[in-house]
Amino acid sequence: KKHFAVIGLKNTDLDIHVIHPISQFITDNWKNKQYNTQRKHANNVVKFLNYLVDNRKKLNISTLCDLNIVHGTQYLNDLTLTGVKRSTVKDAERTLTHFYYWLVKIDVITNVSKNAFEKKESHLGTYFESPFKPLYPTKTNKEIEHTLPISYIPLLLEVAITVAKPIALGLYFQIFGGLRVSEVVNLKRTQVARRMREGDFILKLQNFRTDLKEHSSVKKARTQRVLEVNDWGHSLFRDHIKLYKPIDNSNALFINRDGKALSQRSYRQYFQKTKDYFINLLENHGDNEQKLIAKHLKYMKWSTHIGRGTFTNIIAEDAENPYEIAHLRGDSNIDSSLTYMVSTERIHKKIESKFSN
């Protein structure tokens, strides 16, 4: 089922939406791309158009025909002043460059020449250099943490069970299977199987949740193995299935307090609650080493993706080559990776022994 992003107009009085012809911009540029890519550019255009509507008197414009390069630069500068990240402004600038070029190409903007868009080459292909000259936010000094020390994983899971039980199983899937948050919330109850011998989980990752928004699609449809360690996964799964049963016919594995399928935003909120409690626990009740870890984790920037990073770190210590890591992470086609199944068993045993000590 193919999804397409479109741009609409909303009558706020009647709450009526109509698709705007400017949606053609998305189709012309990204019709063969993933929905999330289309949606990202559509959102960037919508924010720019709403900015033009809200500031039309100050900018002295009444239609898109009045647009010039200065308007785009001014929008990007105002975006910077709102306190967003540098990457957010850069992303908006890329979309705006495409948008302006498209408007010039179809003769909507006549006071900007095609020569304003210089074509460049990179290792990824050709692109147009931005004609805008905005002020970018300063680069943040806060680094991103990608992994969690292995010895702290059991405590993190215990904290999740205590303060964010609806996602405790999801966190386990991320740490011992490398799942992204979008892949976790897309899971249905019927898409979880277990291998008889090792007890590992076999998850079928696809975009089952067509109701999901906010960049929640599965990046790569695949069958993903999640390692069973010390029976933790089995225990979490058994409790989860008993406690959380959807009432909205979604058959979602992860649900909110109302019994409806869990959104990515809600999952992240649960994770933030776990993170805050975890750091507070180490900070106020830990030994000197744990307090140092708490200080480090408090300073660093980290979120749900730390689960995938930690999984990579765990398996990398015992993998003999990059292909074993790629196979376990789901970076390569699992059906064509039978060569590495034996090494998976070896790595599994080594990982389990680490958590048994």
Regions found by a protein language model. Give the residues of each.
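N-terminal core-binding DNA-recognition domain of tyrosine recombinases/integrases
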Residues: 21-39, 43-128, 157
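Major-groove DNA-contacting interfaces characterized by cationic-aromatic clusters
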Residues: 231-273
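Short, basic (Lys/Arg/His-rich) helix/loop patches that form interaction surfaces
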Residues: 272-327
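DNA breakage-rejoining catalytic core of tyrosine-based enzymes
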Residues: 123-154, 213-231, 247-250
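Catalytic-site neighborhood detector that most strongly recognizes the C-terminal catalytic loop/helix
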Residues: 329-354
